[in-house]
Amino acid sequence: MIWHVQNENFILDSTRIFMKAFHLPLFDGSFIFPECILIFGLILLLMIDSTSDQKDISWFYFISSTSLVMSITALLFRWREEPMISFSGNFQTNNFNEIFQFLILLCSTLCIPLSVEYIECTEMAITEFLLFILTATLGGMFLCGANDLITIFVALECFSLCSYLLSGYTKKDVRSNEATTKYLLMGGASSSILVHGFSWLYGSSGGEIELQEIVNGLINTQMYNSPGILIALLFITVGIGFKLSPAPSHQWTPDVYEGSPTPVVAFLSVTSKVAASASATRIFDIPFYFSSNEWHLLLEILAILSMILGNLIAITQTSMKRMLAYSSIGQIGYVIIGIIVGDSNGGYASMITYMLFYISMNLGTFACIVSFGLRTGTDNIRDYAGLYTKDPYLALSLALCLLSLGGLPPLSGFFGKLHLFWCGWQAGLYFLVSIGLLTSVVSIYYYLKIIKLLMTGRNQEITPHVRNYRRPPLRSNNSIELSMIVCVIASTIPGISMNPIIEIAQDTLF
C-alpha cells in the first residue's frame, strides 16, 4: 500500500515537472512568435521540396514572401508592448529590438521579388536559395533580441554561415568562389576574435553571460575599469566591425560584392548592417557602460576612416558593385554617428530613420543593377552610358536612388543625413560631423558621374551593350520592377515628411 502511494506521488511529481518544462518553452514561444512563423515557413519549404516531384516555383516564392509578411504583421501587432525577457534571460523583447527586426524583415521581403528573374535566368537552385535567405533573416532577428553572450554568438554565426553559402551560390563562377573563400576565412577569424573578447568580459564579470548581469558582476568584482575590460572592448569591436564593415575591417567587402550574385549582395548589404548595428548598440551600451569614453573614441576613429576611405576609393572604381561596396563603407560611418550619440540627443531615432532610408536607396539601386545586368551581362560603369535613350524608366530610377544615396535635397537621403548630422552636432561631435559633410560632398561627385553617363545622348558614347539593349515585356520582369518602384518611392517621398517619421521612432523607443 505504501509503495503504491509512493509510486503515485512519483508519477504526479514527474508529470508536474514535465508539464512545467513543457509550459516554459510554450509560454516563452509567444515572445518569439514572428520568428516561429519564419521557422514554420522553413519547415514547409523543406517538406514541399522533399516530397513533391513536380515543383511549382511560384509556390516557393509565395510561401517565403507570405512567411515574411506574416512575421512583419505579428511584429506590428505587438508594437510598443512592455519589455519582456524570456527563455531564462536569453532573449529580450522590447521596442528597440523590434524596430531592427522589422527592418531586417523588410529587407528580406524586398529582396525576394528582386531575386526571382535572376534565379530563373541563371538557373540556380531555388529552394536552397530561399532557405538560406529565410534562415539568415531568422538569425538576424534572434541577433537583435539576444540578451546574453552565447545567444549573440550563435545567432551571429547562424546569419554568417548563411551569408557564406549565399555568396558562393554560383559555384561555377570563379569570382564567386574566390569571394566566398575570403569571406569565410575572414569571417571565421573575426568570430574567433569576438569570442575571445567575450571570454574577457565573462571572466571580468565573475562568470556572467547576460548583458545586464555582466554590468552587475563588474560592479561586484570592481573590474569595470580594469585593463581586462579594455582588452574585451578592443576584441569585441574588431569582431563586430567585420559585420559592419567599417574601415579598416572592410577588406572582404569589395571582393564579396563583386563576386557574389547581385541579389545576394543586395541582401547582405543591408541586413548585415542592420543586425550588426542592433547588436553593437546593445553590447556597447550595456556591458561597456563604464567605458563609454573609450568605445566612443574607438567608434569615432572607425567612422572617420570609413567615411574618408570609403568615399575616396569609390571614385576610382569601374565596377558598379565595387563602387557600391566602398559607398556602403562610407555609409556605415554615418550610421556610427548615431550609435555614438545614443539616446541622449535622438541619436538612435535618427540612426534608425536613416537606416530605413538606406534600405530603400540601396535596394533600389541594386534592383536597377540586377535588371540592367540580366539584359546586358555587364557590371561596368562605362557600359551604362546612354541608358536613358533605351530605357528612361530604369535610368531615372537608378538616378533617383543614387542621388538619394548622395544626399541631395529634397530626397530621403538628404533629410536622413541632415538629421543624423544635426544630432551629432548637438552632441558635440563637431569634427566627426564636419568629416561627414565633406565626404558626403565627395560621394555626390561619383554618383553624379554615373548619372551623367546614364543621360548622355551622343551615339559615339553609347556602348554596344546599350545600343543592342532590348527591353522585354513588362510581365517578364514585374517582380524586379515591384521592388524597384517601392524602393524609388521610399527614396524620394518620405524625406519630405521627415519630422513625423523621427517623432514616431522616438515615441516608439522611449
UniProtKB/Swiss-Prot annotation:
GO terms for biological process: ATP synthesis coupled electron transport; photosynthesis, light reaction. This is NAD(P)H-quinone oxidoreductase subunit 2 A, chloroplastic. The keyword Disulfide bond does not apply. The keyword Nucleotidyltransferase does not apply. It catalyses: a plastoquinone + NADH + (n+1) H(+)(in) = a plastoquinol + NAD(+) + n H(+)(out); a plastoquinone + NADPH + (n+1) H(+)(in) = a plastoquinol + NADP(+) + n H(+)(out). Coiled coil: none annotated. One of its GO terms (molecular function) is NADH dehydrogenase (ubiquinone) activity. Its EC number is 7.1.1.-. Belongs to the complex I subunit 2 family. It holds the Pfam family Ndh2_N. It comes from Glycine max (Soybean). NDH is composed of at least 16 different subunits, 5 of which are encoded in the nucleus.
